[in-house]
Every structure is written in C-alpha cells, then in structure tokens.
Amino acid sequence: MTESIKREFIENAAEIGIDLNDKMLSSFDIYYKNLLEWNAVMNLTAITEEKDVFEKHFLDSLTITKIVSRETLCKGCTLMDLGTGAGFPGLPIAIVFPNVKVVLVDSLNKRIKFLEDTVQKLGLSNVTCIHARAEELSRNKKYREKMDFCCSRAVANLSTLSEY
C-alpha cells in the first residue's frame, strides 16, 4: 500500500478508536492484493482502487466499533457475517480483533474459495468459512442462536434478514 493510503488508513482507524499495528497493516495489504488477483477472474467487487478499497471496504467494516464496544471485541465474542461476499465486514474485523471468532457465510462456493485462500494467506485461526444460504443455515442447530453478533452488508432488507 502506498504511504499516503497507509497514513490515511491509520488516521481514520484511530478516529474510530482502532490502533493499527504493523501486522494488521501487512494483513490488509495482503488481503487487498489477493482481492485484486481473484477479482480479475471473478467478480468480487466493483470497487478496486486502492484508496477506495481501504476506505469503503476495510475502514467501513471496522465501524462495528460504533455499535459493539472495543472491550467486547477485544475480550472475544462470536460474530457471523451473512452474505459476506469478498469478506466484508467479517475479515477486517477478524484481522483487527483476533479474539473474535468470525464465521463467514456465503451462498456462492467460488467466493468461499477466495475467502479460504485469503484466510490461509493471512494465517487467521479465528475465521471459519461456510458455503450455505442464510435461510438454510438458520435451521442448523450448530449455528442457530449460537452467535453473539450477526452482521451483513447489502444482502436483504432488515426485516427479511432478521428472520434468518
């Protein structure tokens, strides 16, 4: 990542109470490069400019700290990201908060393959990737009512999503 984007990312994260260390910054850089590589073969995101990805995907994903306390995220909890797509917001949360057990769920197996590859490259042991539809997974006793938090971006309207 360029120095100016790095500096801006660090400053913007600090504004929402997140101190990014070198390991986290390196992970976001690897994530970004892997996203571009896979996006060339399959459509993961229309947003590909480095500045935009860091602002509109990575930083936006971390705004969960406006709703869930940093203390809760730091001490550990479980979070399911329904319809995660390219891993937003779940993967950025997993990078910054390693004590959060993140379950990434998507209905397209090719996106799960990308996510598994990214998780492996980042060495994240706190992430599980699941190929499933939300409405099917909601009936699975292994996951039903087992998560502390659930998040989603651009999957369905809230009333539909809350049924899952």
Positions of PLM-derived features:
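Class I SAM-dependent transferase core
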Residues: 1-74, 80, 117-127
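A generic alpha-helix surface/boundary motif
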Residues: 7-9, 87, 113
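Residues at secondary-structure transition points
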Residues: 26, 48, 52, 59, ...
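S-adenosylmethionine
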Residues: 77, 99-103, 107-164
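Conserved S-adenosyl-L-methionine
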Residues: 81-85
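Conserved SAM-binding loop of SAM-dependent methyltransferases across substrates and taxa
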Residues: 86-99, 163
